[in-house]
Amino acid sequence: MKTNLADIRKEYSSRSLDTKDILPSPVEQFRLWLNQALEAGALEATAMNLATVNEAGKPASRIVLLKGIEHGSFVFYTNYKSHKGSDITHNSFGALNFFWPELERQVRIEGKITKVSPEDSDTYFNSRPYQSKIGAWVSDQSKEVASREELESKITYYENKYPEGSVVPRPAHWGGYTLKPAYFEFWQGRPSRLHDRIVYDLEGDIRWNVFRICP
């Protein structure tokens, strides 16, 4: 039976959102919602869509995992030589989007992306499981590879080079980024597609302007 995509719809009605109900800090409001998503058992609650733009102005997006909120900025880790790494090198502005369907909520965040310190990258890398560390050496992320067997061969090579229980150094091409927010939108699903949308817009690195926008 063929599904008519135009007929697929869901009515949202479980919650509401108003400016009088939110916290003064968008980061603290985000922490509140994230904790509620975790408590609700949201699947991959820390998963976020990261959107970047390359030097030709072409956008790309992919799912990455939030690994921390440090000094009000959002931290993730990746291969610096990946497509996203190249995009960030040429255009440091990006956007994040978290979607928690269990709570009928999403959060959109815009800001500037910079690398975290090598020390912070080392600390996180050293906390990873052994096979994840090996994987960082094996994968030339976003580059063409001839076969799965080629990847498996590289796994064996690096497992022999860095046996389990030994120190696996962090590759220089692998590390963290942090997105410093300048804009947040908190979205709460409501009936008849008249959703609640509350914005925090940073003014001059000092003050957050808070207002409602139309659905």
From Swiss-Prot:
Cofactor(s), names only, from the UniProt record: FMN
Stretches that traverse the bilayer: none
UniProt xrefs under InterPro entries: Pyridox_Oxase (IPR000659), Pyridox_Oxase_CS (IPR019740), Pyridox_Oxase_N (IPR011576), Pyridoxamine_oxidase_dimer_C (IPR019576), Split_barrel_FMN-bd (IPR012349)
Keyword Secreted tagged: no
Listed Gene3D superfamilies: Electron Transport, Fmn-binding Protein, Chain A (2.30.110.10)
Pfam (any one): PNPOx_N
Transmembrane helix keyword on record: no
Reaction catalyzed: pyridoxamine 5'-phosphate + O2 + H2O = pyridoxal 5'-phosphate + H2O2 + NH4(+); pyridoxine 5'-phosphate + O2 = pyridoxal 5'-phosphate + H2O2
UniProt-recorded name of the protein: Pyridoxine/pyridoxamine 5'-phosphate oxidase
Species whose genome carries this gene: Cytophaga hutchinsonii (strain ATCC 33406 / DSM 1761 / CIP 103989 / NBRC 15051 / NCIMB 9469 / D465)
